[in-house]
């Protein structure tokens, strides 16, 4: 029997509540599909600041080092905003984890589920077609990290500058990640760039074309970022995998998230070259609803499914979770964020419904 060690970092706000439901669902699939998950919980974020005085204690990092994957909840809240920025939960925990594990690839699925069309802000005829896409975003290069970066001059001559830099090897590895994702899906990649203006995008487009030759089954399309943001609104059903640089992926993934209608539905994964990953909901810690039992656990549950698929290659078990989520939603069960006129189910009830549907 295959055994995997999972570092569980529930974090702050609704993190512990939704994490409990993800573990409940994982317990069900490991029993059904015959593999073993060993869960070890660690403090992170504000919870770690309160208990240990720092957002990412040494024992948490050590535990993550010893694990095969990290299942992450959410961090942050108004309680810790008075701290210096680099000591706050988000910057003091997530960014160091990404750096330590060299997590260069961010996967953000965006799916409009049947029965949830009314929550989609797009026109009804567009929403009726549904959509199921994943944004593959490069996380460690580009304008956020490129040098030189800074300010000089004074008065009206004050100047600020950032540099968009990409090495070919950075583009090669993120392109392969996107094509690998496409092979597990509908075999379409849309590479997003600005190759009519930017040198970095010209290299991006050239490199993606080279990598595409390794994946003859995958259909590739190049699209300028400005057009991509429009097509995402006009015809979201036409996208499968969107391959983006850091800044373009930052923008596109949030746009894709918004048109699903609920942040409580959106998982994400950040991976390194070895397939080690950190899996977390795309939404925040929502301290305003923490402890009330009304948070939507689906994003955390789907993040767990992504862990099974991308770090452990347990595709059948991952699909079973995703199908269970679809079935529960199709049966009309909703947490408060999605309840229309129906009586909403609690966080724990939603987790139990999904576990029972596997």
UniProtKB/Swiss-Prot annotation:
The keyword Amino-acid biosynthesis applies. It catalyses: (2R,3S)-3-isopropylmalate + NAD(+) = 4-methyl-2-oxopentanoate + CO2 + NADH. The keyword Cell inner membrane does not apply. Mg(2+) binds at residues 226, 250, 254. It holds the Pfam family Iso_dh. Its cofactor is Mg(2+); Mn(2+). GO terms for biological process: L-leucine biosynthetic process. GO terms for cellular component: cytosol. Substrate binds at residues 98, 108, 137, 226. Coiled coil: none annotated. Homodimer. Catalyzes the oxidation of 3-carboxy-2-hydroxy-4-methylpentanoate (3-isopropylmalate) to 3-carboxy-4-methyl-2-oxopentanoate. The product decarboxylates to 4-methyl-2 oxopentanoate. This is 3-isopropylmalate dehydrogenase. It comes from Mannheimia succiniciproducens (strain KCTC 0769BP / MBEL55E).
């Amino acid at each position: 029997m295959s055994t995997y060690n999972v570092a569980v970092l529930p974090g702050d706000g609704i993190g512990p509540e939704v994490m409990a439901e993800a573990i409940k669902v994982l317990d069900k699939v490991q029993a059904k599909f015959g593999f073993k998950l060993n869960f070890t919980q660690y403090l992170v974020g504000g919870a770690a600041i309160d208990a240990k005085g720092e957002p990412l204690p040494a024992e948490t990092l050590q535990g993550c080092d010893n694990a095969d994957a990290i299942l992450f909840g959410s961090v942050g809240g108004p309680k810790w905003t008075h701290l210096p920025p680099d000591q706050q939960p988000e910057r003091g925990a997530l960014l160091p984890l990404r750096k330590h594990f060299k997590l260069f690839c961010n996967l953000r699925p965006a799916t409009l589920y049947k029965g949830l069309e009314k929550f989609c802000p797009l026109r009804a005829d567009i929403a009726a077609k549904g959509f199921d896409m994943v944004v593959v975003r490069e996380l460690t290069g580009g304008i956020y990290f490129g040098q030189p970066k800074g300010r000089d001059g004074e008065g009206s001559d004050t100047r600020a500058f950032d540099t968009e830099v990409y090495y070919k090897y950075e583009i090669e590895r993120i392109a392969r990640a996107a094509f690998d994702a496409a092979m597990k899906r509908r075999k379409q990649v849309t590479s997003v760039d600005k190759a009519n203006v930017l040198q970095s995008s010209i290299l991006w487009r050239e490199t993606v074309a080279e990598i595409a030759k390794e994946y003859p089954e995958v259909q590739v399309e190049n699209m300028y970022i400005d057009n991509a943001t429009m097509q995402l609104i006009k015809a979201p059903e036409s996208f499968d995998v969107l391959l983006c640089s850091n800044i373009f992926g930052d923008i596109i993934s949030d746009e894709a998230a918004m048109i699903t209608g609920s942040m409580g539905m959106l998982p994400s994964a950040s991976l390194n070259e070895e397939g080690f990953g950190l899996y977390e909901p795309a939404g925040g810690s929502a301290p305003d609803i923490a402890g009330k039992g009304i948070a939507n656990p689906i994003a955390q549950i789907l993040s767990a499914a992504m862990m099974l698929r991308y770090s452990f290659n347990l595709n059948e078990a991952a699909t079973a979770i995703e199908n269970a989520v679809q079935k529960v939603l199709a049966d009309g069960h909703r947490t408060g964020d999605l309840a229309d006129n129906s009586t909403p189910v609690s966080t724990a009830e939603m987790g139990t419904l999904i576990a029972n549907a596997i």
